[in-house]
């Protein structure tokens, strides 16, 4: 189910109603914004009556630019009780955006990729992107941040800029004076 992200009632109200009204042990899948369960106070409350079993983070460009989504799979009527949540990230689905046509499998890659991901999700193993999430800490896939790196050249330039600022030296004026002396 892909409930409206924002509307009069809110997507988590719709999710909650579905989970309450299907038979116990029914598997329910919802496409939601990545952090929706964490940012909305209703998110953690859903876990009192249903188990969030899996989070499948979708590729960045599935919807419009800047909207990142995941598939959240619940088992209705069974409380979470602290059980860890399986999560993975389908970083590349092989689809490409075609102007005025959306995302298309123009290079025929999806079939192979789909089979691989179905196995990974079913077995809950086989990908470096797999995480086991504590629901008391997070309710979304946690992307690893790349370590901050800076080159010696960038560090030197930044330090020079800072020292010139600290000493009150006008960079433009300094550059002009230096150029005049050299020429």
In which residue ranges do the predicted regions lie?
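A conserved structural/catalytic subdomain of Rossmann-like adenosyl-cofactor enzymes
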Residues: 3-183
